[in-house]
Amino acid sequence: YENGTERVAGAIRSRKFDEYDQFVNVQGDMPDVTPECIDKCMWHLKNYQVTTVFTEMPETMQNDPNSVKLVRAGDQALWFGRGMTGYGDWHLGVYGYKKNPLHLYHILNVTKEERVEKLEQLRWLKSGWQIGCLSVYFKGIEINAPEDVDAWHKNYQ
């Protein structure tokens, strides 16, 4: 599998989870994800087939290509990117899905934008799906580089 969504979709196709209608995917680089992040993703599935969460992006992260920026209109994601935008919210690596979109994910085209940005959620957007997004309080650390691991350990000593 190339990304977390493909892994979750693969698990769904194995039919081991037939009794469930909703799923959550927490990216491995987000060790500080809180229950609130997961709960909001799942709660917003009443309005959308695919959901995610975000928080205010610290200014120091705006130009960091490892930090994913979310551009949105209200509670709907318009774009995700790694570029130096100087604006955008901090996209946190938590996704909620209803079952049907996961069954379809493997037939959606991998786009140039997804390959360049290395962001799986762009496949949804470029295929015409809407992604719902909700704000959460988050002051954790995202692990993107070895120095992030050191910073995370310092927070928990």
Tell me what each language-model feature is.
Residues 1-5, 65, 143, 153:
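One-carbon transfer enzymes
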Residues 33-111:
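Conserved core of the sugar-phosphate nucleotidyltransferase
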Residues 19-20, 46-50, 129:
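Short, high-confidence coil segments that cap the C-terminus of an alpha-helix
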Residues 90-157:
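Conserved alpha/beta core of the MobA/IspD/sugar-nucleotide pyrophosphorylase nucleotidyltransferase superfamily
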Residues 1-2, 57, 138-139:
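Conserved beta-strand edge residues that scaffold enzyme active sites
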Residues 1-26, 30-43:
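Short phosphate-binding loop-to-helix
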